[in-house]
Amino acid sequence: MGKTQKKNSKGRLDRYYYLAKEKGYRARSSFKIIQINEKYGHFLEKSKVVIDLCAAPGSWCQVASQLCPINSLIIGVDIVPIKALPNCITFQSDITTEDCRSQLRGHMKTWKADTVLHDGAPNVGLGWVQDAFTQSHLTLQALKLAVENLNTGGTFVTKIFRSRDYNNLMWVFQQLFEKVEATKPPASRNVSAEIFVVCKGYKSPKKMDPRLLDPREVFEELPTGPDNNEAKIFNPEKKVRRRQGYEEGDYTLFHEMPLLEFIKNEDPINTLGTLNKLSEPPQDDHEWKILKKSKLCTPELLECIKDLKVLGRKDFKHLLKFRKQARDLLGLDAKEETQEIEVEPLTEDQQIEKELQELTEKQKQKARKAKKQSNEIKQKEIQRSQMNMLTDMNIGIEAAQIGAESLFNLKTAIKTGQLEKLSKGKKKMIFNDEEIMKDNDINFDEEADANSEDEIDELEAQLDDMYNSYQNRRAERDANYRAKKLRGDVDDEGWEGIESDKEGSDKETEANDYEMESESDSDDDEHIQRIADQRKKELSKNAKVFFASNSIFGELGDEALLEEMNKKEAKTNQVTNENAVGHANDISNKPEQMEVDSSDSENDVSDDSDFEIVPNAPDEELSDSDSDNENDVSRKYSKAKDQQSKVDIATVEAMTLAHQVALGHKNKHDLVNEGIHKYSFRDHDDLPEWFVDDEKRNSKIVKPITKEAALAIKEKQKQLNARPIKKVLEAQGRKKLRALKRLEKLKKKSDMINEDSAKSERDKADEIQKLMKKLTKKQKTKPKATLVVARGSNRGLSGRPKGVKGKYKMVDGVMKNEQRALKRIAKKHKK
């Protein structure tokens, strides 16, 4: 007998068939999922739970068991039985039934699938249209099962046929997944209509529209719109072919209509789009005789209507113009005459009935509107209760109504004439005109005020404690802030118009009391003079030390600086000398003036110089108080000299100001004027510390800086950075100290040797030289062992590694971990 040959139709026994046999796969379709997995980021390697729908004979389950992590859950289901597979759970069921869903839930427990695979197809052979629809319906059922079991971000791979329902399925996939892509792996035959859709990133919506998974909704055929006959008429060159066969009930391709019927038709464009020819009417027709007399009825037009499919846009326009003119000639478009209808006036009963109907309709509208509003309120209340928004909406309305009467009213203050007192900062009550006219006494609840004041004081104390704790926490966390706090930079006040807070507050209180008690003009003048005296303030102590300690102000001279710092003391001396000695005429005739350069004197004249000519009494007539004042001045000047090293120009603004003062661009009056701005005279009394600190930090005048000042500060910072750190300086100092100690020791020993009379001078010199060599000899440091990592060519090496000289030590990662463990244990025992 001859050897039988197996059929090889459509290339079924291709290379993937033999590869599947060699690899042990149950079908050649195994390579389809392998290629899809490689193309789309190896999603199977990341999946712990995989469901294979329509899994028979189980080739995709085999691939999943090989690629998925160990101990993964792989479930295969099909309508036909599947042979048992290692590391897989298989059962027989129809994926469109509820039994399949219950069995899947029983196997998966509370788990969710990371990947759902579907490679099912119906029994084909009935017809291509029927087979394609059945495949699409099966794919939709698989998607429905996948949606119930997929985890968020999961993957769904399915097989579908290219058919008219393909776009509908793709739209459904795009609603449920972030990325949807169709592919055809190389293992799929080219003659096959199958393609695979990979859906990644399942969105897991909280609410699912059931119509997305309903076959009747997804595969519903929408009615096609009417043909675009306008395009056929106005753009006949562009033809769209639709190969869909004949229309129902119409099996002819040639359509003809009489010309007069076309003229009488109300829809000429759609009619022309469906016709092939317009037939000419008989010659004895009365209407046609009228139309033939028209100028547009030419022999060319009669030839054009014999074949409408070859006409162009111009010909169709000419035909439509002829139709319009023909309708005018035949009177088809004539407007109907309007008939006037007389309306009888309404009787009294009819008028009353009409008004009643209107009122009834208005009442119904109001009732509907009120019902609608009540429904909206109920709906809002339901929403608020669902969102736990149960707070009463009317809360605070009563308090607002009560407090509205006590609000400050500027118009009332202007009418009552109390605006002037309010502008001076007096906390007065503003009363209404009626209360002032009645002169009623306004009684306050003293207990309520006391309680409210106690609560306010308690709240302020709590705020102060919280601010202090915040400052302490910040000081512990931030070293720079801690250093600033120790230096006192944090608490420095920018304005020093009053020498002490106590003095300023006392004076202000006295001024307030004085103004409330007296109303005469003389008292007001004295009060104004007192305020002006308070605002006059010289440079502060720190400012004087600053100008005295910097060399950049050397042009002013030490004597001028001394005189400027103690101008008030000199004035006091003058008054004292006049009262004590009584030589006013001699003192006034013989003043002792300062020696100032011509350039300085010119500046003094033009700029209201900072220096003042002060007459002094002769030395022999000076009293004890004068000598004491001179001692105080010299003592303060020496103290300023002592503090010179402590003052430093550290900011660009300070350096800019120093340059301007040194070069004569600014004098004392300019500095005083710049110090008076909108932030200068703010009342800081009885304010919490946190508020004052915030005001200091934010309420500042931004002063301009110069390029030269910035460069000077930058150069200064460079010099500071170039200095060695404290540890290096300390080490150098210790080294020098040790050298000095050795030198002293050598000196003592050499003195002892020189005092020894038993030795000769040569022996003494030799011993001293030996001592010097011994002390100056450098200490030898032990060479450190070279560490060689046991890796690469040095792994498992016995003997000295290549290129290593001297002592060496072999190390590896295990030794490193052991050393870390030993350090950790030692640290633990120390605790």
Curated annotation (Swiss-Prot):
It is found in: Nucleus, Nucleolus. Residues 346-389, 440-479, 729-782 form a coiled coil. S-adenosyl-L-methionine binds at residues 58, 60, 78, 94, 119. It catalyses: a ribonucleotide in rRNA + S-adenosyl-L-methionine = a 2'-O-methylribonucleotide in rRNA + S-adenosyl-L-homocysteine + H(+). Its EC number is 2.1.1.-. Disulfide bonds: none annotated. Keywords: Coiled coil, Methyltransferase, Nucleus, Ribosome biogenesis, rRNA processing, S-adenosyl-L-methionine, Transferase. Required for proper assembly of pre-ribosomal particles during the biogenesis of the 60S ribosomal subunit. Belongs to the class I-like SAM-binding methyltransferase superfamily. RNA methyltransferase RlmE family. SPB1 subfamily. HAMAP family: RNA_methyltr_E, RNA_methyltr_E_SPB1. This is AdoMet-dependent rRNA methyltransferase SPB1. The gene is SPB1.
